[in-house]
Amino acid sequence: MKKLILILLSALMFTGCAGASNHQTHTYRQITMDEAVTMMAQEADYIILDVRRPDEFAEGHIPNAINVANEIIGTADIPELPDKEQLIMVYCRSGRRSKEASEKLVKLGYTNIVEFGGILDWTGEIVTE
C-alpha cells in the first residue's frame, strides 16, 4: 500500500511539473539594427515605436515612427497601439528605454514586439518636426 501511495504521489508530482513546463510566457525579441532595416523593407503591417520623450522625438526620429514615451507605457491605455498582435518595432536613444518599454508592452498583452536599440546607431534617414 505504501508503495502504491509513493508511486501515485510521484506520478502526480511529475504531472504537475509537466503542466508547468507547457506554460508559455510571452516576451519580446531583440534584433540588430540591420535586422530591423530588413524587417521594415519586408513587412507590410508594422508600427515603429519611438519611446523617447516628445522633445527628443521632435529633434529627430525614424520616418513614420510614432511617439509614446516610455514613462507613459503602463499607466493608461495606448490608443496609438490598438492591435496587440500587430508587429511593433521599438527603439529609443541608446537601447535602455526601448528594452524597458518592450517589457512593459509584453506585460500589457502585446505579443509581437521587437526591440532594436537606439537611434544613435541608426544609419538611415532621420526626420525632424
Predicted ranges, named:
Residues L4-L6, C17-M39, Y46, D55-L87, ...:
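Rhodanese-like catalytic fold shared by cysteine-dependent sulfurtransferases
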